[in-house]
Each structure stands twice: as structure tokens, then as C-alpha cells.
Amino acid sequence: VEWSSNERSTITSLWGKINNAEIGQVALARVLIVYPWTQRYFGQFGDLSSIAAISGNPKVAAHGKVVLDGVEKAVKNLDSIKATYTKLSQLHSDTLNVDPDNFKLLGDCLTIVLSAKFGAEFTPAVQAVWQKFLSCVISALSRQYF
């Protein structure tokens, strides 16, 4: 993937405003609430029986931060996203057996959370660059499946 200087700037500028713990928790909670079948991967998280339980679950919060910390690796390695995610893709496909469609669901929820957080700053132009970036991340995470 080729990144223009404007795209690089847009991604790093947006990412610089993101609190990984805050956004990660809200995005992962949204996935678990909106797509309840994804909860099957998180049985060790305890109570996921309601919106309040999911939103207040410390394990959801902690893993949400882990997820965003992982996305941050792509931000810092825009020219080698696939290589950056090789081991993580293997883990999710070979060990955790995560359906790769769930990466898209998480990306969609993350985009919604960012739009809500940043409002008018999250312009269509910013979203277009963000979607390109997320597509690369999702492709890299799904790489071991195919």
C-alpha cells in the first residue's frame, strides 16, 4: 500500500488524539453488545450478560486497550503492516480460531466510536483515510486464514 504524505499525516494526527484505554474499552464493548455472538471468544471475561456488565467489565477494558495498542503498532509501521501482524494473525487463526469477519466488525465499531468522540473533526476525508488504514490492518490480521 502506498501512503501519501497527507494520508500519513492524517493517520498519525488522528492517532495522536486517541486514548487507547478509553477508546479500546468502548469499541470492544460495542462489538460485544452489538454482535453478541462474538462473546464466545471471551468466556474467561466473566459476566457479559448485559450492556452494563459488559461496559463495566475490567477484562473488557483491559483487552480493549490491548487491541488499540495493537492497532498503534500499525500506525507506527505504515510501510510494513502485514509483517507487523504476522504473529498476531497466526495467533488469531491457529490458536484462538477467531472468525476473521470479526476483525471487520471491530473496525466498524472502532470507526463509530471515533466518529462519536471527534465529531466534526472526523470529516469524510479523515474517515476515507482511516478506512484505507483499517482495511490494511484487517487484511494483515486475516492473512493467515487464506
UniProtKB/Swiss-Prot annotation:
It holds the Pfam family Globin. One of its GO terms (molecular function) is heme binding. GO terms for cellular component: blood microparticle; haptoglobin-hemoglobin complex; hemoglobin complex. Heme b binds at residues 63, 92. Keywords: Heme, Iron, Metal-binding, Oxygen transport, Transport. Red blood cells. One of its GO terms (biological process) is hydrogen peroxide catabolic process. Residues 2-146 form the Globin domain. InterPro entries: Globin (IPR000971), Globin-like_sf (IPR009050), Globin/Proto (IPR012292), Hemoglobin_b (IPR002337), Hemoglobin_oxygen_transport (IPR050056). Heterotetramer of two alpha chains and two beta chains. Belongs to the globin family. Involved in oxygen transport from gills to the various peripheral tissues. This is Hemoglobin subunit beta-1. It comes from Muraena helena. The gene is hbb1.
